[in-house]
């Protein structure tokens, strides 16, 4: 994973049209966030010291907010990586401290 990959994913997230077809937008959003999670996990396994991991975690944190997102990305992704010893508590805290928790 490099900055170009992150920039591409960020652009994909920003280009989602939430005002048109919400279900389509929601599906696209989950696809991009799931890809981002895949990049993060792969990078943690291959190059755990990579600085792009922090940037990817921030991008993920900035794009989750509703309760379903937290279950999917906090409980089932971030906490799982911590439990497996792949993600440090400091990096997990970076994610938690930068989420935008909202109702929805």
What are these regions (language model features)?
Residues 1-37:
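Short terminal alpha-helical segments
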